[in-house]
Amino acid sequence: MNSTNTTDTLSQAEIFKRFAIYGDLVSFKPFGGGHINGTYLSVWNQAGTQVRYTHQRINRRVFQNPAAVIENIRRITEHIAAKLIAEAEPAATIATQPTPQPGTAAVPVSRQVLTLIPAKDGRYFYIDPAGEYWRTYLFIEDAVTYERMESSALARKAGTAIGAFQRQLSDYRGPALHETIPD
């Protein structure tokens, strides 16, 4: 088991194992340069295939009701995934399908929307003994994130992505979303 913080290895590994992830935990490490939540990347051996997951400890100073934040994410991602599946070619609906090769049309739904992984108790979060809330996602391979806007072309792409996200939510008719950061 690899980790950069050996004092937390056992407790973090046990937290990650509280989620409904098939296979054996191979390794994990802190991931990214996030400013709000603590993020970790884990690798699991699933019948000989290495599958990665993102785990986040939610910052309760920023989000005072973490369960509401996660419930909003679940509602939104399920809505978008259902739309993408309804519109997709059959091959695109396979959640663990690898990144399509150049020239192929099908893009897996798991590359277009976050896949929130439930805890083994059925909730979409785990509360550790210290009262910290954790959530887990299937890692989106080959995705790129930016810490800062490096060009106007990148700003346009970000705007296009935000617009596409808003369009995907334009017909959301599910339960009202929770207000997670009050005015």
Question: What residues fall within each predicted segment?
Answer:
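Juxta-kinase regulatory segment immediately upstream of eukaryotic protein kinase catalytic domains
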Residues: M1-K29
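Conserved ATP-binding subdomain of kinase catalytic cores across diverse folds
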Residues: S27-N45, T49-D183
